[in-house]
Amino acid sequence: MSTNNLSSSASGRFSLSAAALHILAMALMLMDHLWATLLPAQDWLTCAGRLAFPIFAFMAVEGYFHTHSFRKYALLLALFAVLSEVPFDLMYGGTWFYPVHQNVIWTLLLGLLGIHLMETVRKKQKTWLYLLTALLVVLSGTVLGTLSMVDYYGTGVLTIFIFYFFRGRKWWCLAGQLLALYWVNVQLLGGLLYPVHIFGMEFEICQQGLALLALLPIWLYRGRQGYHSKPFQYACYAFYPVHMLILVLILQYLTR
């Protein structure tokens, strides 16, 4: 069996590789951004887009534990965060400089810097020091994410920490991910409520709560990298600023 296959594990169980999750997350993000620019009447696009960030947050944590150099990983994220800011500002603010909202790569970078600090302390094998550091990192990361107005604000940084603390496939890790993401997305973020009719009964579903569905593909990931190459890696990073810039240019052409 080729190691480049995006699905079907060696054990015969269906699984998704890291490459497949990246592609899925990019497709979901594109849907959300199509709604934000060209197709604002198609609410189903932004509903699907709710699944993108949890997948990116999960893969960022996995990337931390699989990278050979955190320094290079962080610098690459910082580079594309800078390159993505103008396209992001144009898309969400309609201007080259929109200081009240920063792009999602800054969110990922803040979360990973916090994880790196916690892991550095954890390796000193002093439990009390690690627990104290973890508490301070979670609090400061959440506050800093909110004050700096990164995408998803402090709750976005907190989502990354959730996948760090509940990393693994033990039942309590999966339960922790589910309960913590419910708290973050439904209780903290909340948002629009959609009426749904099933068997004559009406229910209201929180739009942001659809982010919990991201756990389905995440739980199908079993540590397999799948297809990997330098061009593919950089294409995944470049997709973020490039697709936003293209959408902005199309929108400006259609509305001029």
What is each stretch, according to the model?
Residues 1-256:
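Alpha-helical transmembrane segments and their immediate juxtamembrane cytosolic regions
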